[in-house]
Amino acid sequence: MAKKSTGAAEGEAKAPAVAAVAPVAKSSSKKKVESGILYVQSTYNNTMCLLTDASGNALASSSAGALGFKGAKKGTPFAAAKVGDVLATKGQLFGLKEVAVVIKGVGSGRESAVRSFITKGINILSVKDVTPVPHNGPRPPRARRV
């Protein structure tokens, strides 16, 4: 039984068909946003911030862990200030002038993240605290004795 020939010599490989790819047009500039909403979630272990436009579409986000802080250092006010500093810089790239702040959580970085926005020159319109408070739910964890 002889092998059937496929048309190409045995040592040759067929050249793949190359499709013409149109270059993707990049937007020349980011969208300009005058006012936005800053969500700050501060826990005992970390501080996370989200910057959105007025309708709630996310523009930028950051956290203490994303900036390289590890372990117990993530929950410090210094780490939260750095998170706010990074987001304020990103917000200025979008042309952000004023934010409404929504704070959630009981961590130590609640205020220092917001203060870094003030030092960058971004106006604070309002501060809203939406920390969930139980109506006598489950028993809370015991207080630490240090």
Predicted regions and their residues:
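Ribosome-associated RNA-binding proteins
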Residues: 2-146
